[in-house]
């Protein structure tokens, strides 16, 4: 690893989803350059990037200029979908190593392309349509083809009109297109994996708890409380269908009455501190492996060394103007608490939770069992208080 020291990595984004990437880059001795147009982004305020450039993570021309300026050895997009394609395109343009080629990155960030690829490969997935029609008789989900987070997603009941939902989804999509998908009822799991030379390695399966707001995760809990073998196989088929040969993969799956259904694949680290959770619960430092793959370093096939309970519990604050945060240091000192951070500062306006960006912070806990980790997370959550007016 000595050859890595003092080399520069471009990281697209500086929000909570990139925290683990910056921490691992620092431990590897890399200079990290955070590209984010928000000077108050969470990781910037935390001081974890070596340097910050006020450029959008979706601006390939500006990112290429920053990479040239620092003679970067790699570019990584972690935790959010949009920059995945940008990172691959800029790396290709500059001749830098990268786990994804531009065509694969484009497929992995386009929900319509994913659906078509899954159909062609026989991957279990919901019924869907791209022409604005209903693909089934039951409830459906209308979503943008090219967006991230929970932007533009609406549930429509069997007798409901699709018109308003389609308009919302198309407005939120980078390409103005929308999908209508069968709503699959059942628990949701996420498969966190790494692909090395075409081989799929499932590292952690977590249960994904959601808030009332459609699709907003409130917790990731590992190990899963459900049988996961079929879900892991579906995740493997889905990543292969997209042509992912190397790099991290994050697969969202609903365990329906007729078996697992793949909701989507992200060719990146998960955005809910999944890399940090994987390291604590399994011993695999997934964020580190992803950083190494982004700079062209060969890494051995990752293997879990333990299987303890682990939880990422997101903190949901009441709406209002934040006056102060209480109990954070006390929570950090509680048994089982490995990480605890808040994303907000006094003076921030806190909104009702409608998308992932509205969450106020997180705690990461571990325990000998899943229940132990859940208990530690609940104690930590109750200790941290957001005082608003």
Named regions from a protein language model:
Residues 1-104, 300, 317, 343-358, ...:
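ATP-binding N-terminal substructure of ATP-dependent carboxylate-amine bond-forming enzymes
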Residues 60-62, 135, 161-164, 320-325, ...:
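Short, conserved charged micro-motifs
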Residues 105-179, 185, 197-199, 220-237, ...:
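Active-site nucleotide/adenylate-binding loops and adjacent lid/helix of ATP-dependent enzymes
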Residues 154, 182, 279, 360-367:
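Short, well-ordered beta-strand elements within core beta-sheets of diverse protein domains
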Residues 156-158, 193, 315-318, 363-368:
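Short beta-strand-to-loop capping motifs
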Residues 160, 182-244, 248, 255, ...:
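ATP-dependent carboxylate/phosphate-activation module, predominantly the ATP-grasp catalytic core
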Residues 249, 331-349:
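A structural supersecondary motif
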Residues 292, 298-336:
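A glycine-rich beta-turn/hairpin centered on an aromatic-Pro dipeptide
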């Amino acid at each position: 690893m000595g050859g890595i020291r003092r080399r520069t990595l471009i990281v697209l984004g500086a929000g909570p989803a990139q925290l683990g990437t910056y921490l691992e880059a620092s431990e590897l001795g890399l200079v990290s350059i955070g590209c984010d147009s928000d000077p108050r982004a969470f990781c910037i305020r935390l001081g974890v990037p070596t340097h910050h450039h006020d450029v959008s993570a979706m601006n390939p021309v500006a990112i290429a200029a920053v990479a040239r300026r620092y003679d970067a050895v790699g570019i990584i997009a972690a935790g959010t979908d949009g920059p995945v394609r940008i990172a691959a395109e800029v790396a290709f343009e500059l001749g830098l190593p990268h786990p994804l080629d531009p065509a694969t990155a484009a497929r992995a960030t386009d929900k319509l392309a994913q659906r078509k690829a899954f159909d062609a490969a026989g991957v279990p997935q919901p019924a869907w349509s791209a022409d604005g029609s209903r693909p089934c008789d039951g409830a459906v989900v209308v979503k943008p083809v090219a967006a991230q987070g929970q932007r533009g997603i609406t549930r429509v009941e069997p007798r409901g009109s699709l018109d308003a939902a389609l308009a919302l989804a198309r407005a939120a999509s980078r390409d103005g297109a929308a999908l209508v998908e069968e709503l699959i009822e059942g628990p949701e799991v996420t498969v966190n994996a790494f692909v090395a030379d075409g081989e799929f390695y499932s590292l952690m399966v977590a249960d994904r708890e959601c808030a009332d707001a459609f699709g907003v995760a409130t917790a990731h809990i590992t190990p899963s409380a459900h049988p996961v073998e079929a879900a892991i196989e579906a995740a493997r088929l889905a990543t292969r269908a997209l042509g992912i040969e190397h790099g991290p993969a994050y697969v969202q799956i609903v365990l329906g009455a007729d078996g697992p259904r793949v909701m989507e694949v992200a060719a990146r680290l998960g955005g809910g501190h999944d890399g940090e959770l994987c390291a604590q619960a399994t011993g695999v430092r997934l964020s580190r492996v992803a950083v190494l793959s982004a700079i062209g370093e060969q890494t051995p096939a990752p293997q879990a060394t333990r299987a303890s309970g682990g939880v990422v519990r997101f903190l949901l604050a009441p709406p209002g103007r934040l006056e102060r945060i209480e109990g954070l240091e006390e929570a950090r000192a509680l048994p089982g608490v490995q990480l605890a951070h808040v994303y907000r500062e006094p003076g921030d306006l806190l909104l009702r939770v409608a998308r992932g960006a509205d969450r106020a912070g997180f705690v990461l806990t571990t325990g000998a069992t899943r229940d132990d980790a859940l208990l530690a997370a609940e104690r930590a959550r109750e200790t941290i208080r957001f005082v608003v007016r």
